A protein has these predicted regions:
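Basic, amphipathic "hinge/linker" alpha-helix immediately C-terminal to the N-terminal HTH DNA-binding motif
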Residues: 83-102
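Short glycine/proline-centered loop/turn elements that form peptide/ligand docking sites
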Residues: 27-31, 47-48, 63-66, 70, ...
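N-terminal helix-turn-helix DNA-binding core of bacterial DNA-binding proteins
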Residues: 18, 22-59
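A ubiquitous short alpha-helical element
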Residues: 21-23, 57, 89-94, 106-107
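Canonical helix-turn-helix DNA-binding module
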Residues: 50-82, 89
Length: 160
């Protein structure tokens, strides 16, 4: 039996492609945090400066500059020394994925009753999840939203 070219191809969902793209760039958790913050800020004002980025992430400007330069070399940012930082199209796609992942994990933690250090816990968890796990967490979040009576039962069960 002859195989068609597509028989040897590996297909993925949108999120799967996003994860592959992320792996292609070999982004460290720290680089993901930078890209996510740049994306958040650029969504609002179109650009960000290194000093502002450093303040938002509570790091030294020199550290922010080094990471911005690496992300620029990877083709995710457009940046010239002492200038503004903007996202390339590829940077926007990955930034959007990273922000959505963050929001999904944060919502999940709230849905299971976490009240303390939600931001810190989200940051600690989000970098270690596969795209499939994020998708399943998102489905659970939507399930709780669609069926609030079940969510209420979960909280009742949690008390025992």
């Amino acid at each position: 039996m002859k195989t068609k070219p597509e028989d040897n191809m590996e297909f993925h969902t949108y999120r799967g492609y996003e994860l592959l793209r992320q792996e292609k760039f070999h982004l460290s958790p720290s680089m993901e945090d930078y890209l996510e913050m740049i994306y958040r800020t650029c969504k609002k004002q179109g650009y960000i400066r290194v000093t502002n980025l450093a303040q938002l992430l509570n790091v030294q400007a020199s550290s922010a500059t080094k990471t911005v330069q690496k992300l620029t070399e990877m083709g995710l940012l457009a940046y010239e020394k002492y200038g503004i930082i903007q996202l390339t199209e590829e940077g926007k796609k990955i930034g959007d994925f990273l922000l959505k992942r963050h929001q999904i994990v944060e919502t999940f933690l709230k849905n299971i009753g976490v009240k303390d250090n939600i931001l810190r816990q989200t940051e600690m968890i989000e970098h270690h999840l596969t795209a499939g796990t994020v998708k399943n967490i998102d489905i659970l979040n939507k399930f709780f939203e669609k069926y609030p009576e079940i969510h209420k039962l979960f909280f009742e069960f949690q008390k025992h």
